[in-house]
Amino acid sequence: MKVIFLKDVKGKAKKGDVKNVPDGYARNYLLKNNLAEEATSGNMKALEAKKQKADQLEQKEKEDAINLKDKLAEIAVELEAKSGDNGRLFGSITSKQISEALQKQFGHKIDKRKIELDEPIRALGYTTVPVKLHPEVSGSIKVHVAEK
């Protein structure tokens, strides 16, 4: 029997896969537990429509990430911190602070986990910080740390 998997089934298939499985296994386990549905022509068309919609959504997310990357390249996030001699900060600037400042100053909401700061910023001046906006799109933000 040909079935469309609705959920991941360990060792068998992932969600959205179409596979041929034994009739008894399909009727007694997969269909009863709503793990799969029979692969009728109507269900196959619905699956194709879902895949197309998911592809369009993915494409839109990628385009949005590219647009955001271009906007971020033009701006510099301004942060203030107390510092001592030689421009060293008391404390440090973290990705969370950069994310909050970006939201407050420019209205761009970027999750702090997407800001790829190897180690916190501990000096005054300009720093370029890489940002992962999408699995296929990376950009960078200029961060200016000024003395308070």
Swiss-Prot record:
GO terms for biological process: translation. InterPro entries: Ribosomal_bL9 (IPR000244), Ribosomal_bL9/RNase_H1_N (IPR009027), Ribosomal_bL9_bac/chp (IPR020594), Ribosomal_bL9_C (IPR020069), Ribosomal_bL9_C_sf (IPR036791), Ribosomal_bL9_N (IPR020070), Ribosomal_bL9_N_sf (IPR036935). Gene3D superfamilies: Ribosomal protein L9, C-terminal domain (3.10.430.100), Ribosomal protein L9, N-terminal domain (3.40.5.10). GO terms for molecular function: rRNA binding; structural constituent of ribosome. One of its GO terms (cellular component) is ribosome. Coiled coil: none annotated. Transmembrane segments: none annotated. Keywords: Ribonucleoprotein, Ribosomal protein, RNA-binding, rRNA-binding. Belongs to the bacterial ribosomal protein bL9 family. HAMAP family: Ribosomal_bL9 (MF_00503). Binds to the 23S rRNA. This is Large ribosomal subunit protein bL9. It comes from Oceanobacillus iheyensis (strain DSM 14371 / CIP 107618 / JCM 11309 / KCTC 3954 / HTE831). The lineage of its organism: Bacteria, Bacillati, Bacillota, Bacilli, Bacillales.
